[in-house]
């Protein structure tokens, strides 16, 4: 019996999924769109107040016109034994789908205090001051307490309850300083003698809120939400916050609130009381209402990417990942093309194909396309963009095995984070549907394994642009797959090429776990990415491509080596290598090796989805 087989008797292959999930009983392929497909909440209103129907309920899928064509693009996942997984379980329905959100002007309407949880977001008081304001959102009740440095924290807002307003006036801030990420909870009776939960969440000093601080605030708030189990929650913003940061706050609040339990044997989600109503009380509310829909879309895109990254490699392999991309394309009406090994051979993608030779799973090249409507006077106004994500579903290092301490081989399922970010962006763009932009979502997906067929150190391989590469290290595989993907992208005739990849561990030492690094050959393009970084609140830092180091990639026998012979700046060297496969197109490379994974929480961040989406939208009209 051959070791590698595709059993015809397995009933849970990708296109024959049972109606019930193996873990939760959530309907899979044959159920209604309402529970299967990502969508905007039916009650979600736009800035104009017009209710929007669920996105997918109003769409027709013309790119993949029928089930037969859909099946044709997908591939049966190879198995060694019949119990091997054949699909990536993805939760397309989350508690956020059922969450009704309202944004209310705190200066015009006080927060009700009849039931549920009321949370005050508070800045710490200024140091060395006897009194201070927290944001000036207006109101009648006042409260003071000891802040940092002996100063006072003051609440300016009121609620629709005299008893609670009196409680707020009394202070009750002992041991609460407003320090970032801290909280204090109360359980008190209101005028109707019903008990109401109150909480303070510290946001740190005023005017210092950034992406990093908002993450901590959201995490502290989520802890309160899970502990309280209230279905109705009101959040009173006693802080000033920019619109983009407000949106990011919601995105991260949603992301932290949803728990990934796909691989648990019991369905714990049914035992949880999820919130159903969320009221956001903030000054100048009209300016923030338009951010709600966008926050939902960005959350879904990020959570979708995170699910792919978190899926272990026996579930997420090149075939199952490409199948997931096909399904996504159908759902958001994208054109879809999956290139198999034969087609890749015809394109002479020798660098990419070499990396996957040791795996039981064949290479799969994902190409999804979004074509926005042309609304301008000239067709030339339509920007064409290629986004490339590194898609190594597991990186053992190959014959240069990740065996050294700190090599984190157990985490190498995350080496397809770039691909996940691109697919998450594809969801967002397919949902928002911007005009005057065409986007190609690309990923050269494979697995870097050790076997008798694996490529070896010292091999000389030929990329699709004809350049020969000496393999100095099989663990520098990502740049080989990206090389052929860059050549493919440039042939599409796009205006910009942006690749995103967990490429070099050196990013952990240069920028740590908070900032991604961006390299490129075009200052204007990099500035666009930096601008998108600010509006998406996904931090990126511009790093140089130092041409002086190019000679360290020289090979005695080939055109170049895939690693440097002398230079230790491996992130810069990797960028120099990629640059060899770009001719004239403006190109940027984003290295997310340090920021993709949340090491403390032991889960992915989904980094890059918002950044890439903002980048695309900034070029759309």
UniProtKB/Swiss-Prot annotation:
Binding residues for Zn(2+) 1: 395, 475, 477
Consequence of substituting residue 477 to L: 11-fold reduction in catalytic efficiency in the presence of Co(2+); 2229-fold reduction in catalytic efficiency in the presence of Mn(2+); impairs formation of stable homohexamer
Region of interest (L13 loop), residue spans: 400-417
Any GO MF annotation of the entry: manganese ion binding
Region of interest (Disordered), ranges: 129-152
Stored InterPro entries: Leucine_aapep/pepB, Macro_dom-like, Peptidase_M17_C, Peptidase_M17_leu_NH2_pept
Record-listed a peptide binding positions: 390, 395, 402, 415, 475
Site feature: Essential for hexamer stabilization: 386
EC code(s) of this entry: 3.4.11.1, 3.4.13.-
Binding site for Zn(2+) 3: 410, 412, 415
Top enzyme class: hydrolase
Propeptide stretch(es), residue numbers: 1-73
Classification via Gene3D superfamilies: Leucine Aminopeptidase, subunit E, domain 1, Zn peptidases
Biased composition, class Gly residues, residue ranges: 132-150
Record field: catalytic activity: Release of an N-terminal amino acid, Xaa-|-Yaa-, in which Xaa is preferably Leu, but may be other amino acids including Pro although not Arg or Lys, and Yaa may be Pro. Amino acid amides and methyl esters are also readily hydrolyzed, but rates on arylamides are exceedingly low; L-cysteinylglycine + H2O = L-cysteine + glycine
Cellular location(s): Cytoplasm
Ligand binding (Zn(2+) 2): 390, 395, 415, 477
CDD domains: Peptidase_M17 (cd00433)
Example GO biological process: peptide catabolic process
Any Gene Ontology CC annotation: cytoplasm
Known function: Aminopeptidase which preferentially cleaves leucine residues from the N-terminus of peptides. Also, has some activity towards tryptophan and methionine and has very low activity towards alanine, arginine, asparagine, phenylalanine and tyrosine. No activity towards histidine, serine, valine, isoleucine, glycine, aspartic acid and glutamic acid. In addition, cleaves the Cys-Gly dipeptide, probably as part of the glutathione regulation pathway; cleavage only occurs in the presence of Mn(2+).
Swiss-Prot/TrEMBL domain comment: The L13 loop movement regulates the transition between active and inactive conformations by repositioning Lys-402, which, in turn, mediates the rearrangement of the binuclear metal center.
Similarity comment: family membership: Belongs to the peptidase M17 family.
Protein name in UniProt: Leucine aminopeptidase
Recorded name of the encoding gene: LAP
């Amino acid at each position: 019996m051959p070791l590698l087989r595709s059993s015809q008797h397995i009933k849970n292959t990708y296109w024959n999924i049972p109606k019930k999930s193996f873990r939760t009983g959530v309907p899979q392929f044959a159920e209604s769109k309402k529970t299967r497909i990502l969508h905007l909440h039916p009650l979600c209103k736009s800035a104009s107040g017009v209710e929007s129907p669920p996105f997918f309920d109003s769409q027709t899928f013309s790119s993949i016109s029928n089930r037969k064509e859909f099946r044709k693009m997908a591939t049966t996942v190879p198995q060694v034994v019949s119990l091997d997984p054949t699909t990536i379980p993805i939760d397309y329905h989350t508690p956020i789908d059922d969450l009704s959100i309202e944004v209310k002007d705190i200066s015009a309407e006080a927060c009700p205090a009849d039931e549920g949880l009321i949370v005050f977001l508070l800045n710490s008081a200024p140091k060395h001051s006897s009194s201070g304001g927290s944001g000036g959102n207006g109101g009648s009740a006042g409260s003071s307490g000891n802040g940092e440095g002996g100063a006072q924290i003051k609440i300016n807002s009121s609620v629709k309850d005299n008893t609670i307003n009196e409680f707020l006036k009394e202070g009750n801030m002992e041991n609460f300083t407003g320090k970032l990420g801290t909280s204090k909870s109360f359980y008190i009776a209101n005028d109707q003698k019903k008990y109401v939960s109150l909480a303070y969440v510290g946001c740190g000093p005023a005017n210092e809120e950034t992406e990093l601080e908002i993450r901590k605030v959201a995490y502290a708030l989520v802890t309160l939400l899970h502990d309280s189990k209230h279905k109705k929650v009101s959040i009173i913003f006693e802080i000033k916050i920019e619109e983009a940061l407000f949106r990011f706050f919601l995105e991260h609040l949603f992301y932290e609130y949803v728990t990934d339990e796909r691989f648990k044997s019991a369905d714990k989600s049914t035992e949880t009381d999820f919130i159903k109503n969320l009221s956001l009380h903030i000054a100048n509310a009209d300016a923030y209402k338009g951010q709600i829909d966008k926050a939902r879309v960005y959350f879904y895109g990020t959570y979708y990417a995170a699910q792919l990254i978190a899926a272990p490699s026996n579930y997420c392999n090149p075939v199952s990942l490409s199948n997931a991309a096909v399904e996504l394309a159908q759902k958001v009406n994208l054109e879809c093309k999956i290139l198999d090994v034969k087609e890749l051979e015809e394109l002479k993608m020798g660098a990419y194909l070499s990396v996957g030779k040791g795996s039981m799973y064949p290479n799969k090249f994902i190409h999804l396309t979004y074509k926005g409507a042309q609304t301008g006077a000239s067709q030339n106004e339509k920007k064409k963009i290629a986004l490339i994500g590194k898609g190594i579903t597991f990186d053992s290092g190959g014959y240069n095995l990740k065996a050294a301490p700190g090599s984190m081989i157990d985490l190498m399922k995350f080496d397809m984070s770039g691909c996940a970010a691109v697919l998450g962006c594809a969801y967002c763009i397919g949902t928002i549907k911007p005009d005057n932009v065409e986007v190609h979502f690309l990923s050269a997906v494979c697995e870097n394994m050790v076997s008798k067929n694996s490529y070896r150190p010292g091999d000389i391989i030929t990329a699709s642009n004809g350049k020969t590469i000496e393999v100095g290290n099989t663990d520098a595989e990502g740049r080989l797959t990206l090389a052929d993907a860059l050549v493919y992208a440039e042939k599409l005739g796009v205006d910009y090429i942006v690749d995103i990849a967990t490429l070099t561990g050196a990013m952990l030492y240069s920028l740590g776990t908070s900032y991604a690094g961006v390299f490129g050959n075009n200052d204007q393009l990099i500035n666009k990415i930096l601008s998108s970084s600010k509006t998406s609140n996904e931090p990126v830092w511009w790093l140089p491509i130092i041409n002086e180091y190019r000679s360290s990639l020289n090979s005695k026998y080939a055109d170049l080596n895939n690693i440097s012979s002398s230079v230790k700046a491996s992130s810069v060297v990797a960028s120099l290598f990629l640059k060899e496969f770009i001719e004239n197109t403006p190109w940027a490379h984003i290295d997310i090796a340090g920021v993709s994974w949340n090491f403390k929480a032991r889960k992915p961040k989904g980094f890059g989805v918002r950044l890439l989406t903002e980048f695309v939208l900034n070029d759309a009209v």
